[in-house]
Amino acid sequence: MDPVVRKPDPGGVQHRVTKALRAIVGHACRHPIHTLLVTALTAATTHLHVLEGTYQATHRGLAPWAKETPLNVQSFLWGSRTVSLGEASAWKWQIDDRPKVPEDGQSDFHWALVTLDLPGASVDASIPFLSNTLSGFLGAEQTTPTPDSSPSPDHSALTFRVPYSQLDGFLQAVEIIPSEKEDDSWRLRSPREEGSPRSLGHWLGSSWLSFLHRVHHAETVDLVIIGLSYLAMNMTVVSLFRVMRHLGSRFWLAASVLLSGAFAFVLGLGITTTCDVPVDMLLLFEGIPYLVLTVGFEKPIQLTRAVLCVSEELWGGGQRQVPNGASSDDSRQNQLIPNIIQLAVDREGWYIVRSYLLEIGALALGAVLRPKDSLGHFCFLAAWTLLIDAVLLFTFYATILCVKLEITRIRSPGGLGQVNAKHPSGIFGHKVKSTNITWWKLLTVGGFVLCHFLQLSPFFYRVMGEYMANGTLPPTAVSPFKEAANGLNEIYLTARVEGFETRVTVLPPLQYVLESAGFNISATKRSTFDGVLDGLESPLGRLCLMGALVVSLVLNNHLIHAARWHAWPQARESAVPDGSYLSVPCSATAPEVCTRPPEETEALLKSNQAESLTDDELVELCLRGKIAGYSLEKTLERIAAGSSRSVTRLEAFTRAVRIRRAAVSKTPSTQNLCSGLAESLLPYRDYNYELVHGACCENVVGYLPLPLGVAGPMVIDGQALFIPMATTEGVLVASASRGCKAINAGGGATTMLKGDGMTRGPCLRFPSAQRAAEAQRWVESPLGHEVLAAAFNATSRFARLQTLTVAQAGIYLYIRFRTTTGDAMGMNMISKGVEKALEAMAAEGGFPDMHTVTLSGNFCSDKKSAAINWIGGRGKSVIAEATIPAETVRQVLKTDVDALVELNTAKNLVGSAMAGSLGGFNAHASNLVQAVFLATGQDPAQNVESSSCITTMKNIDGNLHIAVSMPSMEVGTIGGGTILEAQGAMLDLLGVRGAHSTEPGANARRLARIVAAAVLAGELSTCAALAAGHLVNAHMQHNRSAGATVKK
């Protein structure tokens, strides 16, 4: 396999996008630590910005540098709730979601309940003064405050009911309230300035109560849908971990994907709040699962898979290979970690960006179409989140992949030692000088000092405080009956007596601070530092710091452990044996030294502690019979499942193949012939043995690469196709292509399906020939056919019994079941149905003395030439025909029509009859059938009956008419070898892979038609070469090879 990765040939836009992505990824991967730190710090700063605006106080109105700003009356209505009372509600309070602006003539019956929260020990003495000062102002009336409405014992509350139309004037009037003492006054605090370092707990408690309230009043269907959405989201996350585990990472890559997504969401939320786009927390709670389900984690998985594929191609599964014609320096440059990431981006970057653009475009369209709805706001947030996620994928996550590959390279044998010997200062593909390290240390220390200086600087908070205060999330709505129960009760009594419908808007309590001669008393109770420091003092801030500390410790430990991997070679040899999954396979012919006695290795194997067993020790266990050769895959899979290292099932199977090769090479009875198998040119790496295990082959020691060509294109039933052919016979594909060209000149080939039914013929034994004859009569009767068909059809959705053919030989009875099998070739399907049908025959037909000699009595007849298949057909019965113009026969086939007709009669008809041929009235149909069978994963043995073919030619109006009739074509598009990746790709080439979505069996029938058309092309070209006398010359020119050489 050529390890050189070739770049695609993209179009203009794709080329420019890929080039830009290469530059971005290359820069990020060559400075991984910088990229990780900048991303983490940016996300942390944005996270604190969101917390600052949402939960905590910036107190910009209380700071000595604050500017006087006009009162934003509308902001005090955030979180308010309106209730109504009247005859329509049977004089009971109910939540009223209508607009708060009343209709004309009803303003007197729309009240606002305002609670003033006044701090300070002297407030009790000032309450009479305040009541007299504020009562009657703009129609305000004092009501009895609700008990426990104050947040702390040293706070007092005053409640007023104000006509809603006078609310603006009332709030402006109470912005500053004088105290009974001349030096004291209360100043109104903006809703955005509420809170303290303890407000996060209050916010969480309020959010929990609000959540319970919404759950209590929500519809059951809504709760079920939301629950299912979160369940599906969690399943998506679990699927991410499973896929990453399959790719070789148990935890860290999947966790990095989730961390990158969390960073993207935090940054997107920060941008959204900065743009003054309100974010509805309820819609956010409901919408995030659908965003995760819609977008998923396919793009990070796609990039990860591409990176691993490129690294595998360049490093050759642990052995660095130098491609032919490339110098060692070029190879070394191609194998640098950043270059690997860039090559992966060349392959998949454009497709990932295209997917991102489509998703972002759809979300942006939703934001534009619904700019004032919560759905539009969520689309705005989701679009920004996806855009930032795309940026982080090619920077932050690409850097994580770079670190992962670097650790893998360091831990691989010879990785760090060889690199250090030639490039002692190369890290992440970037040459690092000692002076650069010194500068990096100085910058780190200087940045640390600068951060602390900014934390203590008022200028920092003056700038950042004004910026952070703009991004807030809407608060939780107030509970009217909890905050203003007494006021609502008084209004209720008045409205009930007067009989007027009344609406009341309950505002959240207005927070005040007590100032004395310009000194903020409340401010002295706060922490010394505002801004970011408050965020760090909050419980969530502490949790984030602890999480960052844990991640830092784990990452440093991982990197230090990787660096130590090669520091102590002897310790590494004991910790990572030669048989580990990252090691280079051992040589079977090299002298081996067993480090442990056989008894110890056997004990480890029996006690399920075989993780430390090396390849050589496992080979010795195989040779001593402690591990059966056929069960190596199961044994290695069990060892991998209990391993502490991340070992995939595919890696376990590949290791099993490697060990089996070594065991076969060392088997004493065959060592004189098989000793070179382990180091032979038979390949075994880079193959998906998971598909082979339990399905296609046992005792696997590798795979055979078979040359694959395509003939055509050929027009078959109006559709042009390339026909894949796997063969080692020269001229075959070229000859078929010439036949395709000639057939296309006449309009292409036409095919017909004459029959579709697979057969199985069991052999039954009876006590006497008379009982066998009675059984035959019962099977051929309508009752017998009905019983057998019912039992047979119940075994499969696709198997449907068509006909029963019965033959008797003495006491033996042969029944040939013919049935449809869908898109499968169907031998297993029909065997299961025959077994059940015979059970029904013995039980319901009255033949308990019947004995099944064999399920296949050669009356099928399977994998052998038989007249019953030639006459009655088996599998698909297909005919393909074409008409070739006389001019094409002369120009392309280099012969004439009459010569071809005569040759076909003399050779294919008379000659085959003289030889007593059975189904062999053709030139070389088996050649074409077998080549297509091997290419598409069909059963090679069934080439025997599938190649039964008669070729006919006739001169019609001077043109050549040619046809092939093949009564027993046995093919399928599911099961067997069609599950292998390469063979499945060839079925994709023909458009017939898998089961047909709407018409069962259509893909298999189409494949049979294609094989018959390929035989038609091969027959035409070969007969023409024979007629023109070119066959020998063609084979001498194209089918001659030099003697085989053995690579040393």
Swiss-Prot record:
Domain SSD residues, every copy: 222-403
Residue ranges of the TM segments: 33-53, 221-241, 251-271, 277-297, 349-369, 378-398, 440-460, 543-563
UniProt topological domain (Cytoplasmic) ranges: 1-32, 242-250, 298-348, 399-439, 564-1048
Pfam families the UniProt entry points to: HMG-CoA_red, HPIH, Sterol-sensing
Record pathway: Metabolic intermediate biosynthesis; (R)-mevalonate biosynthesis; (R)-mevalonate from acetyl-CoA: step 3/3
Xref: InterPro entries: HMG-CoA_N_dom, HMG_CoA_Rdtase, HMG_CoA_Rdtase_cat_sf, HMG_CoA_Rdtase_CS, HMG_CoA_Rdtase_eu_arc, HMG_CoA_Rdtase_N, HMG_CoA_Rdtase_NAD(P)-bd_sf, HMG_CoA_Rdtase_sub-bd_dom_sf
Sites where a glycan is attached: N470, N520
Keyword terms, alphabetized: Endoplasmic reticulum, Glycoprotein, Lipid biosynthesis, Lipid metabolism, Membrane, NADP, Oxidoreductase, Steroid biosynthesis, Steroid metabolism, Sterol biosynthesis, Sterol metabolism, Transmembrane, Transmembrane helix
One term under GO cellular component: peroxisomal membrane
First-tier enzyme category under EC: oxidoreductase
Membrane topology: Multi-pass membrane protein
Binding site for CoA: S735, A736, S737, R738, G739, C740, K741, V892, L893, K894, A1034, H1035
Lumenal topological segments: 54-220, 272-276, 370-377, 461-542
Binding site for NADP(+): S796, R797, F798, D823, A824, M825, G826, M827, N828, M829, I830, S831, N1039, R1040
Active site: E729, K863, D939, H1035
GO process annotations (BP): coenzyme A metabolic process; ergosterol biosynthetic process; isoprenoid biosynthetic process
Main location: endoplasmic reticulum
Locations listed in the record: Endoplasmic reticulum membrane
Superkingdom of this protein's organism: Eukaryota
Reaction equation(s) it catalyzes: (R)-mevalonate + 2 NADP(+) + CoA = (3S)-3-hydroxy-3-methylglutaryl-CoA + 2 NADPH + 2 H(+)
GO MF terms held by the record: hydroxymethylglutaryl-CoA reductase (NADPH) activity
NCBIfam families in UniProt: HMG_CoA_R_NADP
Function: HMG-CoA reductase; part of the first module of ergosterol biosynthesis pathway that includes the early steps of the pathway, conserved across all eukaryotes, and which results in the formation of mevalonate from acetyl-coenzyme A (acetyl-CoA). In this module, the cytosolic acetyl-CoA acetyltransferase catalyzes the formation of acetoacetyl-CoA. The hydroxymethylglutaryl-CoA synthase then condenses acetyl-CoA with acetoacetyl-CoA to form HMG-CoA. The rate-limiting step of the early module is the reduction to mevalonate by the 3-hydroxy-3-methylglutaryl-coenzyme A (HMG-CoA) reductase.
Protein name as it appears in the record: 3-hydroxy-3-methylglutaryl-coenzyme A reductase
